[in-house]
C-alpha cells in the first residue's frame, strides 16, 4: 500500500477513459506515474505563481500530470493530464 492515498478528479477520469481507447501507451505511463507519485509525492516539482500549491510531472515528453498534496489527509489529488502548452495556458 502507498504511503499516500490518492484520488482522481472527475475530469481526469474522463480524459483517462478516452486515452485508454486511443493511446494505451500514454494511459499505462500515466497510471504507473500515479502509483509512483503516491509513494513519494514530494519528489516532483512544485509549481509557482497562479499554480502554486500544485506539483507536476511530465509523461511522454509532451504531457503534464498535475496534482496537489493534502498532508493532513495523507492524500494526493490528481487534477489534470494535458498537453504541456495547455497546462500553462490554464493559469
Where are these regions (language model features)?
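Enriched for short, Lys/Arg-rich terminal
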Residues: 1-6, 17, 24-28, 59-63, ...
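N-terminal first-folded block
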Residues: 7-42
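Residue-level recognition of oxygen-bearing side chains
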Residues: 11, 42, 52, 62, ...
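A short, surface-exposed loop/turn module that caps and links secondary-structure elements
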Residues: 32-58
Amino acid at each position: 500500500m502507498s504511503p499516500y492515498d490518492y484520488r482522481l478528479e472527475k475530469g481526469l477520469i474522463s480524459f483517462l477513459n478516452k486515452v485508454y481507447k486511443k493511446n494505451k501507451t500514454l494511459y499505462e505511463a500515466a497510471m504507473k506515474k500515479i502509483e509512483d507519485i503516491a509513494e513519494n509525492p514530494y519528489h516532483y516539482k512544485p509549481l509557482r505563481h497562479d499554480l502554486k500549491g500544485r506539483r507536476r510531472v511530465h509523461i511522454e515528453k509532451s504531457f503534464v500530470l498535475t496534482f496537489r498534496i493534502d498532508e493532513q489527509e495523507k492524500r494526493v489529488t490528481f487534477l489534470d493530464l494535458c498537453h504541456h502548452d495547455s497546462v500553462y495556458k490554464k493559469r
